[in-house]
């Protein structure tokens, strides 16, 4: 039984019903429908912390999905899982791939900035101020991109940029 048919959460059930209706009425190919089903199941598994299952669904969705915009969100979600697992280098790769297909994803820029900022903090703890400045500068560049795309979001990042003289 597909994951989408065994959701217990009301919001998930509602989303699934609406998505199923849309898939029936909007003219799409069978391949697009399958890709969306895997994507939806991946989101459901991800929201429940079932990251291995989510990744399997996302990889299957990537195999089927041909639209670059839709692929960008699949790649972004794969990046989120790697971020959650502490696999920052992999996460950055997936965020980059998502942005190659859709440069208007402020959340990808934000997450890349957060990873770079974290690495800057780690460099400070390891006594490497040069590396920390490099990481912080990179974080600043990503946050500037995120803020450019979504000016009313990322207030804390905006404040950090001002406080550190990077804005």
UniProtKB/Swiss-Prot annotation:
Topological type in the membrane: Peripheral membrane protein
Domain of life: Eukaryota
GO CC terms: chloroplast thylakoid membrane
Biological process (GO), any one: photosynthesis
Compartmental location: Plastid, Chloroplast thylakoid membrane
Gene: ycf3
Keywords annotated in UniProt: Chloroplast, Membrane, Photosynthesis, Plastid, Repeat, Thylakoid, TPR repeat
InterPro entries per UniProt: PSI_Ycf3_assembly (IPR022818), TPR-like_helical_dom_sf (IPR011990), TPR_rpt (IPR019734), Ycf3/AcsC/BcsC/TPR_MFPF (IPR051685)
Alphabetical list of Gene3D superfamilies matching this protein: Tetratricopeptide repeat domain
Chain's role: Essential for the assembly of the photosystem I (PSI) complex. May act as a chaperone-like factor to guide the assembly of the PSI subunits.
TPR repeats: 35-68, 72-105, 120-153
This protein's name: Photosystem I assembly protein Ycf3
Annotated coiled-coil segments of the chain: none
Organism encoding this protein: Marchantia polymorpha (Common liverwort)
Family stated for the protein in its record: Belongs to the Ycf3 family.
């Amino acid at each position: 039984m597909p994951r989408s048919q065994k959701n217990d959460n009301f919001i998930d059930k509602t989303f699934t019903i609406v998505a199923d209706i849309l898939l029936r009425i909007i003219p799409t190919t069978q391949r697009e429908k399958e890709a969306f089903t895997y994507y939806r199941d991946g989101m459901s598994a991800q929201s429940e912390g079932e990251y291995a299952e989510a990744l399997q669904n996302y990889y299957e969705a990537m195999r089927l999905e041909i639209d670059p915009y839709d692929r960008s969100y699949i790649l972004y979600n794969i990046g989120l899982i790697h971020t959650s697992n502490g696999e920052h280098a992999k996460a950055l790769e997936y965020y980059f791939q998502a942005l190659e297909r859709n440069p208007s994803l402020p959340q990808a820029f934000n997450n890349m900035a957060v990873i770079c900022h974290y690495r800057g903090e780690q460099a400070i703890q390891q006594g490497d101020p040069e590396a920390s400045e490099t990481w912080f500068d990179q974080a600043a560049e990503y946050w500037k991109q995120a803020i450019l795309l979504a000016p009313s979001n990322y207030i804390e990042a905006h404040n950090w940029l001002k406080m550190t003289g990077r804005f």
